[in-house]
């Protein structure tokens, strides 16, 4: 039983060590960058640097940040197969996309070579 707990802990540590942080800035009535490529376990943080209240809503992924006042931020940890489009429901012209997968970055590098 102890060996199983140790193995689970080591796997969790390895997973956490490879997870990345991605930052999306909300400013000028836009999300920047508009497209983020990430892996399962990565964290996306949206930071509101605009002078208006915004939110981050992804119906397909089943989340809504709630209202983010200027200076506030919100985080979401990505799961496998969780690519999604999102928007600010207060300002629907503000949109973005997060693509989640282990091979996204590799495939993009190959296509630009």
Protein language model features and the residues they cover:
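Hydrophobic h-region of N-terminal signal peptides that target proteins for export
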Residues: 8-18
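Extracytoplasmic copper-binding redox domains, predominantly the cupredoxin/blue-copper superfamily
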Residues: 17-113
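Positively charged n-region of N-terminal signal peptides that target proteins for export
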Residues: 1-5
């Amino acid at each position: 039983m102890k060996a199983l707990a140790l193995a689970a802990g080591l796997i969790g540590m390895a997973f956490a060590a490879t997870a990345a942080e991605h930052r999306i800035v909300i400013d000028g009535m836009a999300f920047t960058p508009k497209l983020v490529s990430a892996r399962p376990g990565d964290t996306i943080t949206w930071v509101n640097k605009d002078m208006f209240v915004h939110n981050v809503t992804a119906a397909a992924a089943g989340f809504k940040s709630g209202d983010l006042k200027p200076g506030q931020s919100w985080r979401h940890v990505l799961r496998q197969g969780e690519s999604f489009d999102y928007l600010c429901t207060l300002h629907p012209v503000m949109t973005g996309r997060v693509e989640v997968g282990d091979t996204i970055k590799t495939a993009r590098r190959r296509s630009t070579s």
